[in-house]
From Swiss-Prot:
GO terms for molecular function: catalytic activity; deacetylase activity; lipase activity; serine hydrolase activity; triacylglycerol lipase activity. Glycosylation is required for enzyme activity. The gene is AADAC. It catalyses: a triacylglycerol + H2O = a diacylglycerol + a fatty acid + H(+). It is found in: Endoplasmic reticulum membrane; Microsome membrane. The active site is at S189, D343, H373. Coiled coil: none annotated. It is a single-pass type II membrane protein. Disulfide bonds join C116-C340. Its EC number is 3.1.1.3. The chain crosses the membrane at residues 6-23. This is Arylacetamide deacetylase.
Amino acid sequence: MGRKSLYLLIVGILIAYYIYTPLPDNVEEPWRMMWINAHLKTIQNLATFVELLGLHHFMDSFKVVGSFDEVPPTSDENVTVTETKFNNILVRVYVPKRKSEALRRGLFYIHGGGWCVGSAALSGYDLLSRWTADRLDAVVVSTNYRLAPKYHFPIQFEDVYNALRWFLRKKVLAKYGVNPERIGISGDSAGGNLAAAVTQQLLDDPDVKIKLKIQSLIYPALQPLDVDLPSYQENSNFLFLSKSLMVRFWSEYFTTDRSLEKAMLSRQHVPVESSHLFKFVNWSSLLPERFIKGHVYNNPNYGSSELAKKYPGFLDVRAAPLLADDNKLRGLPLTYVITCQYDLLRDDGLMYVTRLRNTGVQVTHNHVEDGFHGAFSFLGLKISHRLINQYIEWLKENL
């Protein structure tokens, strides 16, 4: 073997080593998933390197790369797409072109991205909104919100809430031809967090007379108190969303102070005065038995009250919807929840399903045995189309 052949062989082995990740047997299209993961891993590694050099914040590097995937608000043969502002928050509105004798459904969608990255303009979210508007014959509002690290909680929550309240005004609904009795909210990941949080907040808002008919939460992040759930342990290094990245997202939501991130990773961020909150996220009593699988529940390690005083957001129900008491949950609308087996956020969704059902809320739970975080969003994968079809069919029947 010549030098050139040997060199190519070594390079090929290194590339294969970088790309290859062992995956469960029931996961479809494993090599396509590995390629996508290698792309994301490369971005993450570059972002880490740039941050170490002091040139750019880690999340800002992610945003720069993501901006190349943004598309303009362009109408097509089926859907009219416009970009406007709802209460100073930039949104995209998708309206079917075909005539309708009746008022249409309305769906308010919130993108994911760990409260730090993402946009309604990303091609995947744009395409999802088009499909939903066309197939559901619905007006879809896809909202933006200000992002960390420049903006921290509660800014993201407030932006989404203010845009939603604007949409729920009678004259706005009339402008877009939306039936005020058929409005729903949806979001994925951090967007699912925000969807759950603002839906709870609406229950206490006397100024909003129009109520949501449904909420649809796609692998939502619902609490930062316990980041050592069975799903975190099982999927800490799974594709697309690792434990270290998720904890970084959570901490950046509240502050750029990395001490919160370190405390979260060691489970020493919750002060003993807030110990009563753990009953809302106690997986030993809230997870179905088959998801516990021999995991042993350990009592929390309490930290000092200093972090909670500096950054109280991580104990705030508006950031952690699982911390809502049963009286609040009891008033929530019909709910659809997607959870994925190979997702570290799986148990957040499972616990929310249990708590909602325990308070009498009607819940449709779609647990995806071959699913993973991002399965709904990577539109080049077969599983994404399957989940979107199931999602839209549920909306057709219930919204």
